[in-house]
Amino acid sequence: IVNNNINNSLLWLRRDLRLYDHNALFQALRKSKAVYCCFIFDTKILEKLKIKNDRRIEFIWHALKEIKEDLNNIGSDLIIEIGDPVILIPSLIKKYKCSALFLNKDYEKYAIERDKKICNALQKDNIETYKYKDQVIFEEKEILTQNNSPYTVFTPYKNNHLKKIFNEGITQFDCEPYKINLAQFKNKPLQSLKD
């Protein structure tokens, strides 16, 4: 079901650097008239890197370059910023007149705390935040013992995990038919890694 009740929305890419089989993108495209995609190089994470030219940054840069090219080919673009997402996300929401933020969940402690700050700030401005499961098959409370507690023994957990996959399958999110709802705009060029 497509329900474009949101005019503009912002999709925040993080660990999920792709435009296919992407839960938050799929949901944003189905619920929004125009979706702006962004990625933020979080300076609080970058500052912790011991090596300035870390290979992970190079990998991310190449993935962003590919995403930007794919978006450019269909008249859209990728917003890439460097800074604190707690400041930048609300700023981008205002700049692009978005009424919703879509993102896939991140399960790291720092990310959970950061995302909570962002959601609270957006909520004050009546901006909806939609978070989706993406980087895991099952979240921590989706596979529990019969007592509704986490497993402490691996084999019963594994058996339940496999049974659940067999019974429910793994959902895939076909974004292609909805990419017409990507915002049509041109953003600044991608900076080189040296910049």
Regions found by a protein language model. Name each.
Residues 150-195:
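Glycine/tryptophan-enriched, flexible segments
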Residues 1-166:
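Trp/Phe/Arg-rich N-terminal binding region typifying the photolyase-homology
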